[in-house]
Amino acid sequence: MSAATVILILLMLLGILGRSNVIAAAAAFLLLLQFTSLQRFYPILERRALEAGLIFLVVSVLVPFASGRVAPRDMLQSFVSLPGLIAIASGIIATHMNCQGLELLQRFPQMMIGMVIGSIIGVAFFGGIPVGPLMAGGIAALLVHLMAWLR
């Protein structure tokens, strides 16, 4: 059994233990590709899977607008109320941090294991919800930058 297979199995198990269906499913999918000798699709997935996933994520967020469940008046409220402005600022900060997290994970993919373990601890002991590696990566990137700044 190759080291890559062991890592994917470990990630899948950690995802299951941490109740992170996304990590577990992604690892299982890659294992399926490995076991069916379809690794030739890895380069395509590496280039396009994140983009495809983000498209589906944005589609799911936009469905309330498309279905008419969010009225134009509600949208305008987000620009003139304090909670709305806080939400806009939070979105800006979160997307920037997610970008930093993605860059960190691309440079240091081995950090994924630590983030999954951290997610498991967060879910098991702190009532957290495992939402994905980008936010954890964003926070890790912030902490790495902070540590470098403090040196």
From Swiss-Prot:
It is found in: Cell membrane. The keyword Membrane applies. The keyword Membrane applies. GO terms for cellular component: plasma membrane. It is a multi-pass membrane protein. The chain crosses the membrane at residues 6-26, 52-72, 75-95, 111-131. Pfam families: DUF441 (PF04284). It comes from the Bacteria. InterPro entries: UPF0756_TM (IPR007382). Keywords: Cell membrane, Membrane, Transmembrane, Transmembrane helix. PANTHER family: UPF0756 MEMBRANE PROTEIN YEAL. Belongs to the UPF0756 family. This is UPF0756 membrane protein Moth_0120.
